[in-house]
Amino acid sequence: FAPAGNVTRAEMAKMISIIMLGNVDADAFKGTITDLTDINGHWGEGFIKYCYSQGIIAGRGDGTFAPNANVTAVEAAKMLLGAIGYNSDVQGYVGSDWAINVTRDAQLSGFYADLKGLTANKTLTRDEAAQMIYNAVDTGIVKKTPNWNSSTGVVTYSYNKQPDTDDLLKNTFDVTTTETTLTKTEYSSEKKEYTYTLADAVNGSTTVKSTS
């Protein structure tokens, strides 16, 4: 796994494609037209073009994506905010203040949980990327809602953060997470078996057995 190794921008695009698509082959997106000049033929082309098609990435602003460049924490956070549904133009992820606005929303979304000392411009390591991605898939997605003004006929859109139970883990992988409290531990010397009782607000009490 090489946890201390650096993550490239192409690798980040691949990981985001997986949390969005599951097992769907991103090669289907190789035909997507973009204004990026340095990705055709790259191993990550399909993943990059998928992310581009979803508004998750937009390149460097000079027509390039720099797929082999290391990704920084704030760049990864911007991609992940797009993955959970935020709109870059609405949230101010473009222009001179983009990094400030990305950092604000990433912190509010809990992307930096358990990542002490991570600074915006630090090159992201593989273990940091794994933690940030886990934090992103475990937070509520953002839903785009149309609002129609019957008087003017104008449609505007609002972006609303959903509860943490409505997240990418559930939407992509049909996985639900819950926090539990260990309330009781028992040991049977006859069976050489531990029984743990866990409790949470959703499922009540659950017992788990473990053989010593």
Please place each PLM-identified region on the residue numbering:
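Surface-exposed binding/hinge segments that line
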Residues: 127, 131-132
